[in-house]
């Protein structure tokens, strides 16, 4: 009995190693641009997230490379499907707001007044010009309130802004809701006064529109 259990464990470890190797191979080659392969690699890396995290911490002392790779794979896997969504919103982190921000907070996040002290005024303008509604959240608990709100009714696409860790985490969680996601990373991680490359953000919006042949 114990011999059989031992053999099963060995087989399981070997299969796991093979799956991880395939996922890493896809993640580090041109295959990651292929949606089907990227989707496969993303699922495998999600399943083995904790051991992968331990490996990255051991070799790199910083898991950001892992989170970036996982977020990039999810983007490549979902980009085309995201471009076909009809009702899209942008979720942005409160760490981008100015330290002196006086905007009030409701159940759907911080209500930006476009004062111009941080990136949100321009980000809000860009988002609305391309058919997105911007929501500034202080935590993941706000997402469920936003998706239930009348203003976000029928949302089938979420463009998430944040650090690579939060983007990867958010995309993984929203996948359970059958909502297509796409992530755009901040220029740097942090708890306050963070920024996004606004030109790159708009390029991404235009690119996503181009994939579907029209503006949302």
Residue spans for each PLM region:
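N-terminal, charge-rich interaction modules
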Residues: 2-121
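Cytosol-/stroma-facing membrane-proximal "stalk/adaptor" domains immediately downstream
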Residues: 111, 120, 124-216
């Amino acid at each position: 009995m114990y011999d059989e259990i031992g053999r099963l464990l060995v087989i399981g470890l070997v299969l796991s190693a093979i799956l991880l190797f395939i996922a890493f191979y896809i993640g580090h080659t041109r295959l990651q641009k292929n949606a089907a392969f990227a989707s496969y690699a993303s699922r495998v890396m999600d399943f083995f997230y904790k051991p992968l995290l331990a490996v990255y911490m051991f070799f790199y002392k910083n898991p950001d490379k892992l989170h970036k790779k996982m977020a990039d794979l999810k983007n490549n896997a979902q980009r085309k499907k995201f471009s076909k969504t009809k009702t899209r919103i942008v979720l942005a982190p409160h760490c981008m707001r100015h330290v002196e921000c006086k905007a009030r907070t409701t159940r759907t996040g911080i209500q930006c007044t476009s004062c111009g002290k941080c990136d949100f005024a321009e980000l809000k303008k860009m988002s609305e010009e391309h058919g997105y509604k911007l929501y500034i959240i202080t935590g993941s608990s706000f997402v469920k309130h936003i998706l239930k709100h009348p203003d976000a009714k029928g949302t089938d696409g979420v463009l998430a802004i944040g650090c690579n860790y939060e983007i990867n985490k958010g995309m993984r969680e929203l996948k359970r809701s059958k909502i297509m996601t796409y992530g755009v990373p901040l220029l740097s991680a942090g708890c306050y006064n963070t920024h996004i490359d606004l030109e790159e953000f708009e390029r991404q919006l235009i690119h996503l529109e181009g994939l579907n042949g029209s503006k949302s």
